[in-house]
């Protein structure tokens, strides 16, 4: 009967309501409702899984992109470090080669040309502080062949690794990042102020050098104060074609870039005498220097610090010329 009635519906002989009732019974009897539910559940599951896959895929792309960015930053940082290291090494190797080719250490006694005396005619330097460490013998002809801008050679007795040729450029920028061979290198050169006399005859000669992290150039200069190296020796040497000049350190301080430490004087007047006395009083350590006066010849060694506006400065006055 159900089949006949259903067939009659299909032939258009039953009403729409009856047809719907018979159709629903037919679906119910054959379990087709559960099939519809299952189909709907299956469709929802597929949609949910598709959404999850899309979400997972987008999340995966994000992390991959983040990884690639991190990798790029790492590679760039490594490149920077390697470049800096190679630059440091190049500078160190160059100065070592120059030192080996142009200097030798000698233990031969030095001949006195002139030594500083006080107003009473007594030597400024006491006998117990006579020369115990000779400066290097410098072949200035060989140095001048490398660079005609060379004006001297600097060496600190307490820190013998601070032993470098001194240059002078037409301005204070040229040798800031150029070596003695005039090749670009961040370490640059040890150089005197462009306005100073090249023979160190000025009242105050300023000598600049970088505070290199690898300890080269003036990278160890602060050890004179911070590590107490001045206790080993408070003397430094400047060798020139005209002679070997010995200087006694009388001041070590941190100074602002605009400080009067960098004042240049045209003559040994009272103003310069006041300046020398002031520098001695500003020293982080009382060097107990005797006989400071307006007649002194001063060299000012200056290097940068971690503070861009501050410099570490070591000042010394001439006490003798030798050969």
Model feature map: region roles:
Residues 1-106, 304:
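Gram-positive cell-envelope targeting signals
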Residues 74-323:
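Solvent-exposed, non-transmembrane regions of membrane-associated and secreted proteins
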